[in-house]
Amino acid sequence: MTYFVLFLGLCFVLGGLAVASKPSPYYGVVGLVLASVAGCGWLLSLGVSFVSLVLFMVYLGGMLVVFVYSVSLAADPFPEAWGDLGVVGYGVGFVMVLMVGMVVGGFVGSLDFGVVTVDSVGMFSVRLDFSGVAMFYSCGVGMFLVAGWGLLLTLFVVLELVRGLSRGAIRAV
């Protein structure tokens, strides 16, 4: 199980690297999906199933919609793939900066791969992440509304930025 969790962590980092290496938006979407699936699978394997489900729905429901609209409205005649020299250069540069930062920060020798879960202890039947469901819906309502409004605003900003000189999503009535 520990190897599976480490594999999901590696997939999460590689997905983030695939988005950060600035390929064409077509390939950036694939990296975003890989990172979100691996990150939510990582949380799921650690026992945080509700938070994993909420984050997965936010990632794929919000951020992926913005990527899909930007890809459909800004088509590249010659998209950059992950094998192009510039994209590989960015990827190698990010990995080198990460490795130098770990060596300089002293994290290399102190990495501990112990994995713990958030399961309930003893005879308790309620897991720890399910006790936070009430907090999501009672105290977190305002934050959900702010996050939803931010995603909607981001969608309209991206649509306005990629529309060019033609009529876009927001028109004067």
Swiss-Prot record:
The answer to whether the entry has keyword Transmembrane is yes
Q: Name one Pfam family in it.
A: Oxidored_q3
Q: What GO cellular component term, any one, is given? A: mitochondrial membrane
The subcellular localization recorded is: Mitochondrion membrane
Q: How does it sit in the membrane?
A: Multi-pass membrane protein
The answer to whether keyword NAD applies is yes
Q: Which InterPro entries match?
A: ComplexI_Subunit6, NADH_UbQ/plastoQ_OxRdtase_su6, Nuo/plastoQ_OxRdtase_6_NuoJ
What EC class is this?
Answer: translocase
EC? Answer: 7.1.1.2
Purpose: Core subunit of the mitochondrial membrane respiratory chain NADH dehydrogenase (Complex I) that is believed to belong to the minimal assembly required for catalysis. Complex I functions in the transfer of electrons from NADH to the respiratory chain. The immediate electron acceptor for the enzyme is believed to be ubiquinone.
Question: Per its record, how is this protein called by name?
Answer: NADH-ubiquinone oxidoreductase chain 6
Tell me what organism the protein belongs to: Aethia pusilla
Taxonomy, top ranks, is: Eukaryota, Metazoa, Chordata, Craniata, Vertebrata
- Gene responsible for this protein: MT-ND6
